[in-house]
Amino acid sequence: MCIRDSYGVETSYVPLDDPSAWEAAIRPNTKMLFLETPSNPLTTVGDLRALSALARARGIPLVVDNCFCTPALQRPLELGADIVVHSATKYLDGQGRVLGGAVLGSRKYVAESLQPVVRYCGPTLSAFNAWVLAKGLETLSVRMARHSENALAVARWLEARPEVERVRYPWLESHPQHALARAQQRAGGAVLAFDLKGADAAACKAAAWRVVDGCRLLSITANLGDVKSTITHPASTTHGRMPAEARREVGIGEGMLRVAVGLEDPQDICADLARGLAG
């Protein structure tokens, strides 16, 4: 956000799941539509077909952050997106070994927009990091299938817990955009979020941190994309710099926890969460 502001970039924020709000927010100086789907940490799903149609009608590129799904589970370019970005540090590598990213688009976009930049900044990772990332890609489809299978099992388990108010995971039938997720993703991915019950914000926050502190298998970190399961409190970490009122408006409450479900046995993951929920 600070880097964006230093370049004088203006940003309009809109509800991800409301295409009409996107259309209303477009101004004469709008240069692109940018989204992450599913979103972090709410797992809201953006309608890529509808938004790509809107972008084409307005002559604006649609840029999609596909970090959560990776190409194994979702292919935005095939759904009409113009540009796709990935954090290769996350699931593309999958084992927390390298830092990297990827920008994908048409040959025309690469030639006209990317090539002038990479000519001076460099277009590649170091040879070793590139090799490690290439080895990680060899297992991408297998890993993402297991991540998704485990995450769905954990999400269903959490839905049955009396301490939990709501579970947010696109592959659950209770997710408000379950049908849309099914239409554009191959599986639900690794990341879910859940909201704990509590009398007020302070009670919810205390309950959330009791869960975090009680876990032993899950790593306590804002990072994700590893084979290991991780847990974090978004209101204190990833979204801690947002004003509290802004967090409440978008639905990131003090009782929300985000879990990036790893490749461990799902029974072990649930047992660790049960330990945390027990306080």
What is each residue range found by the language model?
Residues 94, 125-129, 183-187, 249-254:
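Short, flexible turn/loop "capping" segments at secondary-structure junctions
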Residues 113-114, 207-211, 269-273:
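Hydrophobic side chains in well-ordered alpha-helices
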Residues 4-162, 168:
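Conserved PLP-enzyme active-site core in the AAT-like
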Residues 98-100, 187-191, 254-258:
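Short, solvent-exposed beta-strand edge segments and adjacent coil->beta transition regions
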Residues 7-12, 28, 229-279:
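PLP-dependent enzyme catalytic core of the Aspartate aminotransferase-like
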Residues 42-43, 71, 202, 206, ...:
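Residues that form or flank phosphate/diphosphate-binding pockets in enzymes
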Residues 152-227, 243-244, 248:
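Conserved small-domain helix->loop->beta segment predominantly found in fold-type I
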Residues 132-142, 189-201, 258-262:
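Short, well-ordered beta-strand elements within core beta-sheets of diverse protein domains
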